[in-house]
Amino acid sequence: MIVGRPDGRPLVVAHRGASVDRRENTVEAFEEAETQGADWVELDVRLSADGVLVVHHDAHFDDGRLVRETPADEVPDYVPNLAEAFEACGGMGVNVEVKNLPGDPDHDVSDQVCAAVAGLVAAYRPTDELLISSFDISAVDRIRGTDPTLPTGWLVVERHGTDLVLDRVVAHGHGSVNPWDELVDESMVVAAHQRGLRMVVWTVDDPGRISQLADWGVDGIITNRPELARRVIDGRLDGTWVDG
């Protein structure tokens, strides 16, 4: 489960790795994220035609092929499988985002990707260095149903109202809520923590906003710019950061 540092600093979570400086969701992006001081990496997984978890955001590769219809040995060279991605993330925690939304061209109603994720991740990270999330709450429900020890969180992008969202996360037994930055104010952070939830906000690259979220006590900040986020968060404590 994603937990902020003991000194109160939120964790820096590199969005698809150091995605400003390297190609997103690649071994190079994950390695660069650790070099830039990220605590965690967020990455996306989909299932190949032969049931291998591959790390890719979109349903299609750049050449137009559908990930779900492509065998693992035919995916582009830059696309790692999930096991390779875990290895590339070194000592960082990993937030695995499951991509299987209704309406996606590769949507699988049987949620085979969830079973595959649940069967693999525990071999690569202890639960305190792992979070599995999805925009589809039924996907993380399936993960939790397969292995209740795996930390899970719901990614939220729509404006349903704070109480409704947070109460739904609690009712489904998930430990984390991962809202879009534009939904977040201080009262939402307080309300989440009052319910015993962790909050991981995405995707934040503005230094002033990073500092504000840290002031509010969020547990993690997903960012495309881990080096910047690291400087802002650490500088708030030692007095070296000046906004603007």
Residue ranges of predicted features:
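Aromatic/hydrophobic pocket-lining residues that form the small-molecule binding cavity
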Residues: 26, 78, 82, 114
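An active-site metal/cofactor-coordinating segment within enzyme catalytic domains
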Residues: 2-12, 35, 39-40, 45-92, ...
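Short loop-to-alpha-helix "cap/lid" segments that border enzyme active sites
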Residues: 2-7, 89-94, 98-244
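N-terminal beta1-alpha1 ligand-phosphate binding loop
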Residues: 32, 46, 223
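Functionally critical loop-and-helix segments that line ligand-binding/catalytic clefts
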Residues: 15
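Short amphipathic alpha-helical segment that frequently serves as the phosphate-/nucleotide-binding helix
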Residues: 24-31, 44
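Hydrophobic transmembrane alpha-helices
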Residues: 18-20
